[in-house]
Amino acid sequence: MKHDFQTLSEVFHHSIDKYSKRPAYEYGEGQNYSYDEFGDVCRRLSKNLANFGINPYDKVGLFSQNMPNWSVAFFSIVAFGRIVVPMLTELSENEIRNILTHSDSKALFVSKKLYSRVPEDILEKMHIVIATDDLSVLRANDEAY
């Protein structure tokens, strides 16, 4: 069957519906998701972003080395209409500042290992900062929006 997907969001929602009970990915102990579970985690994160004023078409930074939750972060952004701003782990503090400032990013997913490289003045502007490692909230700013 041929599909004419126009967006990653369409692919995501189709896959969650069609393959719900199948494994989406497996990574070591405790990080195994069926498509259903993967979709649930992404929806919860998306709702968390919405609760902090991150709406469709808003930009969300993604600054993390490769890890299983990188894909969770990515799809919690793009599958619900937001725009991902991916950043290379080799970027300097000034480059991180420039990218997040010029993109007008309102939220950030960042690994705990790289968190200290994000300039404080940028962190203060973020509505919410989420760790890609365990998807915990590292910082939330109700007054940012």
Question: What function would you assign to each model-found segment?
Answer:
Residues M1-D4, E37, V84-M87:
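Short, flexible loop segments at the rims of nucleotide/cofactor-binding pockets, characterized by
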Residues L8:
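Short recognition helix of helix-turn-helix/winged-helix DNA-binding domains
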Residues F52, A79-Y145:
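Structural core segment of the AMP-binding/adenylate-forming
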